[in-house]
Curated annotation (Swiss-Prot):
Organism from which the protein derives: Dictyostelium discoideum
Superkingdom as given in the UniProt entry: Eukaryota
Positions bound to a carbohydrate: D209, R218, W238
Gene label: dscE
Region named Beta-sandwich: 1-155
Motif, Cell attachment site: chain positions: 81-83
Binding site for Ca(2+): N39, S40, D47
Task of the protein: Galactose-binding lectin. May be necessary for the primary process of spore formation and may be involved in spore coat formation.
GO molecular function: carbohydrate binding; galactoside binding; metal ion binding; N-acetylgalactosamine binding; oligosaccharide binding; polysaccharide binding
Entry GO CC: cytoplasm; cytosol; extracellular matrix; phagocytic vesicle; protein complex involved in cell adhesion; spore wall; vesicle
Region (Linker): 156-162
Protein name: Discoidin-2
Pfam families: F5_F8_type_C, H_lectin
Ranges for region Lectin-like: 163-257
Keyword Calcium found: yes
């Protein structure tokens, strides 16, 4: 599986801080965990193993990458240790939006990982994971818990804060101009561009074409069933009102932190 086009390598570009549960020693730390890391091979300036390696071999080990800013992660790649036959064969992921409360990815799904030293295995996130920090928890391994990895995120310009889309929607076909009592008609609104997370939608009526019921104007609009792709606008009237048309403006706003 390939990395989504246009995504940013977070670890290689030092966009995230790294921490681990344990390190085998100072030469096997998180600084060596970047995908494709290779040591100098010069004995006079040995710069460590070609991976992060834990000092304890159990399912409580982890390596976490995080920051205080929200990112939309689109993929993760893993790789084994380049200078020994050690690699993680499966793992779980956990992530957090507030750096306090953690969530297991896909309800604790065990993700198949590597089978050799240097092959790269990539998993894409669809939809993207909105988080400040992500942790990888090795579950099974070959010889030792050792890995190199990379996290990929959307570039900042792809999700400016806040993201806003506007538009209008009308009844359009006089569906509510006859009959009595409660009557409704629904119009589905599709956003021009899909949001990354469910936005807040506000509506306001800008045009009313209707006949009163004994001097009373009875109509209402509601935004419902809001998703990242759109929402339903429900037009309502009641009594003896005849509503020929209503037009609403909408503003959809996505906040990312």
């Amino acid at each position: 599986m390939s990395v989504p086009a246009g995504s940013v390598s977070c670890l290689a570009n030092a966009l995230l801080n790294l921490r681990s549960s344990t390190d085998y020693n100072a030469d096997h730390g998180v600084k060596n965990s970047i995908l494709n890391f290779s040591n100098s091979k010069d004995a006079s300036r040995f710069d460590g193993s070609e991976s992060w390696s834990s000092s304890v071999l159990d399912k409580n080990q982890f390596i976490v990458a995080g920051s205080d800013s929200v990112k939309h992660f689109v993929a993760i790649s893993t790789q084994g240790r380049g200078d020994h036959d050690q690699w993680v064969t499966s793992y779980k992921l956990r992530y957090t939006l507030d750096n306090v409360n953690w969530v297991e990815y896909n309800n604790g799904e065990i993700i198949n990982a590597n089978k050799d030293r240097n092959s790269i295995v990539t998993i894409n996130f669809n939809p993207p994971i909105k988080a400040r920090s992500i942790a990888i928890h090795p579950q099974t391994y070959n010889n030792h818990i050792s890995l190199r990895w990379e996290l990929y995120a959307l570039p900042v310009k792809s999700y400016s804060n806040p993201s806003v889309q506007v538009g209008e929607v009308s009844i359009g076909d006089r569906s509510l101009n006859s009959g009595t009592g409660s009557r409704t008609i629904v119009r589905h609104v599709k956003f021009p561009v899909e949001f990354l997370s469910v936005p807040i939608v506000s509506i306001g009526c800008k045009k009313v074409d209707a006949h009163t019921d004994n001097g009373q104007m009875r109509w209402e609009g509601k935004s419902e069933n809001i998703t990242t792709k759109g929402f339903d606008l429900t037009f309502i009237t009641w009594g003896n009102n005849a509503v020929y048309d209503l037009t609403f403006d909408y503003v959809a706003v996505e906040f990312n932190n």
